[in-house]
């Protein structure tokens, strides 16, 4: 992990296309601006963790539903013969 100190109106560059600018520092809060290409997704970490958890729940639900559908198809086709 790289640790840097920055003052208000100073920035860091990540590769050539991402810039993180320090806008404001108050007590225990730092306000930043991030300039990045539109195809780069930027999330607050707590939001990103929430998205990951919701995606995991969705996958488990889908697996359960697929299993139910498979069971119904198997039951249906066994009764057709």
Curated annotation (Swiss-Prot):
This is Translational regulator CsrA. Keywords: Bacterial flagellum biogenesis, Cytoplasm, Repressor, RNA-binding, Translation regulation. It is found in: Cytoplasm. A translational regulator that binds mRNA to regulate translation initiation and/or mRNA stability. Usually binds in the 5'-UTR at or near the Shine-Dalgarno sequence preventing ribosome-binding, thus repressing translation. Its main target seems to be the major flagellin gene, while its function is anatagonized by FliW. It comes from Borrelia garinii subsp. bavariensis (strain ATCC BAA-2496 / DSM 23469 / PBi) (Borreliella bavariensis). One of its GO terms (cellular component) is cytosol. It holds the Pfam family CsrA. The keyword Ribosomal protein does not apply. Coiled coil: none annotated. The keyword Aminoacyl-tRNA synthetase does not apply. Homodimer; the beta-strands of each monomer intercalate to form a hydrophobic core, while the alpha-helices form wings that extend away from the core. Gene3D superfamilies: Translational regulator CsrA (2.60.40.4380). Belongs to the CsrA/RsmA family. The gene is csrA. GO terms for biological process: bacterial-type flagellum organization; mRNA catabolic process; negative regulation of translational initiation; regulation of bacterial-type flagellum assembly; regulation of carbohydrate metabolic process. One of its GO terms (molecular function) is mRNA 5'-UTR binding.
């Amino acid at each position: 992990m790289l640790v840097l100190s920055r003052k208000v109106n100073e920035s860091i560059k990540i590769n050539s296309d991402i810039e993180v600018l320090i806008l404001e520092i108050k007590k225990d809060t730092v306000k930043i601006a991030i300039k990045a290409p539109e195809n780069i997704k930027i999330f607050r970490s707590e939001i990103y963790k929430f998205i990951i958890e919701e995606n995991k729940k969705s996958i488990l639900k889908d697996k359960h539903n697929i299993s139910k559908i498979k069971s119904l198809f198997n039951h249906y086709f066994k009764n057709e013969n």
